[in-house]
């Protein structure tokens, strides 16, 4: 009997409480960067019934109307009705932001290398904290992402499209998806085994109507027919009712959906969240750089699967480690790939910021439906512009 395995990933909609918090944090970051690209920002958000708290550390010359940014973000998501228990114009907004610690700032503003005499401008900025970050790519999808998380994101994005267009008028903003994919003995996806979708809805909507609409207009519109068969299981609103949702149903916090934000559990994660952080925080910028490296390695044909780990010390510019793992799929030794990566990519924080142009207000758009593998927006870490350089670097190393 051939050995087959299942793997499951989930996603959540922009109206999920944790994602509301992420989007508010990144909307604040973008508003600040639009006025002050050199700002240091660590903005956290908590949402619950009727209230939003924004707190954290910020050093900037910009002045922004946080109250307005918060309300506009909530309205864009779709929380505009008082009956939702959380409405853009009626929530209480409570900001509590202070200046970044001087002890941290001195290591970020002048890295150890700079203090020791390195005059390279890109050695001037130190990492904003210690930590380890992972990036991943695999040739399962055109965007080089694992199939389970790719499908999960597409399902909740489709729900949002149908809600905002009015095609399914009873939908409300909160939703979750989960997709289980079956893999063959060669680790190739062969079918979708299970799809779970829970979507918030108006009280008059019936379970039968919701199931029919979600299967026909969401699942079958997103998942290729070749992956669906008579044995594929659908669980649509399996509790039977999902009227109370969003922050009325659960509180939400920035940074609680880090697996949704990345690879759906298919790859390792260093533990650091992204939203609300400027690019001097390597939790964010180095994770983007690691994805950029992994995607270009796979696209270059140097591996069919690649995971890149980067690690940093606070106040130090150069990474303390760079690791490439291809799970036995590389065409050359992994040590060669690591050497090529170091040759092609400047992985100092300032190098990453320059390479990916990360001082721009581009972050709010990443705060729902994944930071990696996006095909609907132009993100610099998704570009395949290092393929030739990597191939040439491998030749020089060999």
UniProtKB/Swiss-Prot annotation:
Binds 2 divalent ions per subunit. Binds 1 potassium ion per subunit. Gene3D superfamilies: 3.30.300.10. Signal peptide: none annotated. K(+) binds at residue 44. ATP binds at residues 16, 174-176, 241-242, 250, 256-257, 273, 277. Keywords: ATP-binding, Cytoplasm, Magnesium, Metal-binding, Nucleotide-binding, One-carbon metabolism, Potassium, Transferase. The keyword Nucleus does not apply. This is S-adenosylmethionine synthase.
């Amino acid at each position: 009997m051939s050995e087959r395995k299942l793997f499951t990933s989930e996603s959540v909609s922009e109206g999920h409480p944790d994602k509301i918090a992420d989007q508010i944090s990144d909307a604040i970051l973008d508003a600040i960067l639009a006025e002050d690209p050199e700002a240091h920002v660590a903005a956290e958000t908590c949402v619950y019934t009727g209230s939003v708290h924004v707190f954290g550390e910020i050093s900037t010359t910009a002045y922004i109307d946080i109250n307005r940014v918060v309300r506009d973000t909530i309205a864009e998501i779709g929380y505009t009705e008082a009956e939702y228990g959380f409405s853009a114009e009626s929530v209480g907004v409570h900001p509590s932001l202070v200046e970044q610690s001087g002890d941290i700032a001195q290591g970020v503003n002048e890295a150890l290398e700079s203090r020791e005499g390195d005059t390279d401008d890109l050695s001037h900025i130190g990492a904003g904290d210690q930590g380890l970050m992972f990036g991943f790519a695999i040739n399962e999808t055109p965007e080089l992402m694992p199939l389970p998380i790719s499908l999960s994101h597409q399902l909740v994005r489709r729900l949002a499209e149908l809600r905002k267009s009015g095609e399914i008028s009873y939908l409300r903003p909160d939703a979750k998806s989960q997709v289980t994919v079956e893999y063959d003995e060669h680790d190739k996806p062969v079918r979708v085994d299970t799809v779970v979708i829970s979507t918030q809805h108006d009280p008059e909507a019936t379970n039968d109507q919701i199931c029919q609409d979600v299967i026909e207009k969401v699942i079958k519109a997103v998942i290729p027919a070749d992956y669906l068969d008579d044995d594929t299981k659908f669980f649509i609103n399996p509790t039977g009712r999902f009227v109370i949702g969003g922050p009325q149903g659960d509180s939400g916090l920035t940074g609680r959906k880090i697996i949704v934000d990345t690879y759906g559990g298919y790859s390792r994660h260093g533990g650091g969240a992204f939203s609300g952080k400027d690019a001097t925080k390597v939790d964010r910028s180095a994770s983007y750089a690691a994805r950029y490296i992994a995607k270009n390695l796979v696209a270059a044909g140097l591996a069919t699967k690649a995971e890149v780990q980067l690690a940093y010390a606070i106040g130090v510019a150069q990474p303390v480690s760079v690791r490439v793992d291809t799970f036995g799929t590389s065409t050359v030794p992994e040590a060669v790939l690591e050497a090529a990566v170091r040759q092609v990519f400047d992985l100092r924080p300032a190098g990453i910021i320059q390479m990916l142009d990360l001082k721009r207000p581009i972050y709010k758009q990443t705060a729902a439906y994944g930071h990696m593998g996006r095909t609907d927006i132009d993100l610099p870490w998704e570009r395949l512009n290092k393929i030739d350089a990597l191939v040439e670097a491998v030749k020089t190393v060999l």
